[in-house]
Amino acid sequence: MKNKVVVIVGVPGVGSTTVTNKAIEELKKEGIEYKIVNFGTVMFEIAKEEGLVEHRDQLRKLPPEEQKRIQKLAGKKIAEMAKEFNIVVDTHSTIKTPKGYLPGLPAWVLEELNPDIIVLVEAENDEILMRRLKDETRQRDFESTEDIGEHIFMNRCAAMTYAVLTGATVKIIKNRDFLLDKAVQELIEVLK
């Protein structure tokens, strides 16, 4: 039986990692196992090993050709893992760079991963802004609520494009303030 590959995406600060971790925890209790792989972490490990970055948030500042090369290497590494486990790939649908939006899952990565489902985790623009302002653990560029809305729109466009190329389904889950459990439950149903 083919292992499931589920890609979970969201703009920075939306809480996609939190929703994913809680859903996977609950599924484990039911005997359903997934390995969570953060695409950015795999990219960071490769870039750090090569001496290109010191901290993760520097990745998006690398020249686009470097980012693309590292993406390809990360895609190959994750595809190897998917041969052994059900995989949840925690990543970004698009990455906002100084030169424009970079697809988080370009064709060369999609070919490797061949996802079954793409899940977009979203929230209201102002909720995301407030979460970012409270998070002192990351070095993020400031974005207005309008910028965040544009990024969410670009993520949706990219996710549907990825689906057209792979045949994956696309599910949108809202992670609203004080409704984390609802978002977690929705993701559990998608992953079952």
Curated annotation (Swiss-Prot):
Question: Catalytic activity, per the record?
Answer: AMP + ATP = 2 ADP
Q: Which UniProt keywords apply?
A: ATP-binding, Cytoplasm, Kinase, Nucleotide-binding, Transferase
The protein's Enzyme Commission number: 2.7.4.3
- Temperature dependence of activity: Active from 70 to 90 degrees Celsius.
The Swiss-Prot or TrEMBL record annotates one GO molecular function as: ATP binding
Cellular-component GO terms for this entry:
cytoplasm
Q: Which residues bind ATP?
A: G10, V11, P12, G13, V14, G15, S16, T17, T18
Supply the enzyme class, top level. transferase
Similarity annotation:
Belongs to the archaeal adenylate kinase family.
Fetch the HAMAP family from UniProt: Adenylate_kinase_AdkA
Q: How does it assemble?
A: Monomer.
Q: What is this protein called?
A: Adenylate kinase
From what organism does this protein derive? Methanocaldococcus jannaschii (strain ATCC 43067 / DSM 2661 / JAL-1 / JCM 10045 / NBRC 100440)
